[in-house]
């Protein structure tokens, strides 16, 4: 597969028509009324959901090798959870809990503590699903297990394996179960440790906060500044801490590439290559949009919109997934649509989703699009595409899984 992305030859805007037929099938999807397209996406999502469950749960004999939400079986449970939210089908919630139970057993001895790649994801999703299904004993069990998670002193701070990945799980639980289910003192303690380490590492540079993961100072959502700032903005910060978060994001804006894209790390400031959620403009655009909401400063919204232009032009990736694929990049436009109400952003999300709906299966089967090392997983594979399609049913409720609350 030469090149990282498909040339985006889709029109900047296509007016919707009540009746479309013949000609280019992708163009027809772009012209289809949103209400009709969203139902088509929903049907495709539910079909994909069944395939994902069969491939990750049925064919495995209901055994779990990789329990994580990112690349493993818990991702299927999270997709079922989202399907339940969209359709109200209680069978999806029941199966979600069944899969979480198996993941609970498989992860019992895991030292990983985050939502996406660790024990907190299992216990967090288990608690929320149990709450929604009215199973009080099971809810208390998962909350009890969550409270047993301990953060080591040498834990990194990033989203996939570090402190903010644990913190996000706390916030997820409190959103669905109740504000003080996990105490604000617990959350503050973790946030303060993150800020303390960020300030310590930043002493030699221009950014108020800086973090390191395996020897590199990453900027992106998965391992770096964008992901850490994003989660911290959902926590009650002291004024000086909030200023440091704001200043860190302004440092990133000031040091972006002329193209509007962002370096993957401090060490990669000359490499304008990646346009992924994990590294580059997409994940950072989501964080800047969040900053506009939290701080009320137009600079952040303008920077998010500029990053979205990069995603539109270079983000039609030759990968399907949420982490580094088209599915994840579509969330940039959904977030900006929520923030601005501008139809052009909904159209762009619709365009990326329509491209996947129309051409994704064929491109995957021909090897012209990469399905990821775990092809049915949430963050690398087609489960992420199904999740996006479900989120397209009601764009006002769309949230990047494991990142936006």
From Swiss-Prot:
Binding site for Zn(2+): 278, 323-324
SMART domains: LANC_like
Record's function text: May play a role in signaling. May be not involved in abscisic acid (ABA) signaling.
Name the record gives this protein: LanC-like protein GCL2
Family classification: Belongs to the LanC-like protein family.
One annotated GO biological process: carbohydrate metabolic process
Protein's UniProt keywords contain Metal-binding: yes
């Amino acid at each position: 597969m030469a090149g990282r992305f498909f040339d985006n030859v889709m029109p900047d805007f296509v007016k919707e028509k009540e009746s479309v037929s013949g000609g280019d099938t992708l163009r027809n999807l772009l012209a289809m009324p949103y209400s009709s397209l969203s139902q088509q996406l929903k049907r495709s999502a539910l079909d994909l959901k069944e395939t994902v469950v069969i491939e990750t749960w049925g064919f495995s004999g209901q055994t779990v090798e990789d329990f994580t939400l990112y690349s493993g079986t818990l991702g299927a449970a999270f997709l079922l959870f989202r399907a339940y939210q969209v359709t109200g089908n209680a069978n999806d919630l029941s199966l979600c809990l069944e899969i979480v139970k198996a993941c609970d057993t498989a992860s019992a001895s895991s030292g990983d503590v985050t939502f996406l790649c660790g024990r907190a994801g299992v216990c967090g999703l288990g608690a929320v699903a149990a709450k929604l299904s009215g199973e009080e004993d099971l809810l208390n069990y998962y909350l009890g297990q969550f409270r047993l998670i301990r953060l080591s002193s040498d834990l990194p701070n990033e989203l996939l394996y570090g402190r903010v990945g644990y913190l996000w799980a706390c916030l997820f639980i409190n959103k669905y179960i109740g504000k003080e289910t996990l105490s604000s003192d617990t959350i503050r303690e973790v946030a303060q440790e993150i800020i303390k380490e960020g300030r310590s590492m930043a002493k030699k540079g221009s950014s108020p906060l800086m973090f390191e993961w395996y020897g590199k100072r990453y900027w992106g959502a998965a391992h770096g500044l964008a992901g850490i700032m994003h989660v911290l903005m959902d926590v009650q910060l002291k004024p000086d801490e909030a200023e440091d978060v704001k200043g860190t994001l302004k440092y990133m804006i000031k040091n972006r590439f002329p193209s509007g894209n962002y370096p993957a790390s401090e060490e990669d400031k000359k490499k304008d290559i990646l346009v992924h959620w994990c590294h580059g403009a997409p994940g950072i655009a989501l964080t800047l949009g969040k900053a506009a909401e939290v701080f009320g400063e137009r600079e952040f919204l303008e920077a998010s919109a500029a990053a979205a232009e990069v995603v539109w032009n270079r983000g039609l990736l030759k990968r399907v997934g949420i982490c580094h694929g088209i599915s994840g990049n579509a969330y940039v436009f959904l977030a900006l649509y929520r923030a601005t109400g501008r139809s052009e952003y909904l159209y762009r999300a619709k365009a990326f989703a329509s491209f996947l709906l129309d051409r994704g299966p064929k491109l995957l089967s021909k090897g012209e699009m990469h399905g990821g090392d775990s092809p049915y997983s949430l963050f690398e594979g087609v489960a992420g595409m199904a999740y996006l399609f479900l989120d397209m049913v009601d764009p006002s409720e769309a949230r990047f899984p494991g990142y936006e609350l």
